[in-house]
Regions:
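A conserved catalytic-loop motif detector
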Residues: 52, 60-79
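Active-site Gly/Thr loop motif
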Residues: 21-25, 71-128
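Active-site-proximal alpha-helical segments within enzyme catalytic domains
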Residues: 38-59, 116-132
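Non-transmembrane alpha-helical segments in soluble domains
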Residues: 12, 16, 48-55, 71, ...
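Structural helix-adjacent loops and short alpha-helical linkers that scaffold large soluble proteins
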Residues: 1-12, 58-66, 139
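A structural signal for well-ordered alpha-helical segments within the folded catalytic domains
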Residues: 9, 45-48, 143, 147
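A small/polar active-site loop signature that marks catalytic segments
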Residues: 1-29, 37
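Structured C-terminal helix/loop/strand segments within mature extracytoplasmic catalytic/sensor domains
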Residues: 107-161
């Protein structure tokens, strides 16, 4: 990182603390800031609140809870061609622990362990927080399923094809 602070510490100090979670938060990292066991443990409600705060920060000039640089970094147009994320649309890329999803819309996801995810569509002001227990660790099938669920919710449909 450019300021010498590990990403996990930035996330905790500049984002998570400002979000003021309602329930206990678990963050596991080693002394160098490397996440352990998936790193973050939030209640589903606090996970969804974090997503809503991201949406509110993007659509408002008052970004006191979310640093301006963080929102802009998440929604910036795709950079140079990075490593493909198997299971997600071509052009999806990792940013600050999130995934900027492929396509024209300003959409990001935070994908946790075993399928838990936070999907944020800034253009539609849509937040979807899901808790899951999928018996694997970020397989392409899991990521493809999550992407289909997000698309179905976005369409307002209850079916996934």
């Amino acid at each position: 990182d450019s300021n010498g602070m590990p990403l996990s510490h930035q996330f905790c100090e500049q984002l998570l603390v400002r979000a003021k979670p309602e329930h206990a938060v678990l963050w596991l990292s080693d002394a160098q800031g490397v996440e352990l066991a998936g790193g973050l443990g939030l209640s589903l409600r606090d996970f969804a609140r974090l997503g809503q705060q991201l949406v509110d920060a993007r659509s408002s000039r008052n970004r006191s809870k979310i640093p301006n640089w963080f929102i802009e970094a998440l929604v910036a147009p795709p950079a140079l061609r990075g490593a493909e994320i198997s299971g997600l649309g071509k052009g999806s890329e990792r940013r600050y622990g999130f995934v900027r999803l492929a396509g024209a819309a300003q959409r990001v996801a935070l994908i946790g362990g075993h399928g838990t995810s936070l999907y944020v569509d800034f253009d539609k002001r849509l937040v979807v927080a899901t808790f899951a227990s999928y018996p694997g660790a970020h397989s392409p099938a899991e990521l493809a399923l999550l992407e289909q669920v997000w698309k179905a919710v976005e369409r307002g449909s209850g079916t996934v094809k």
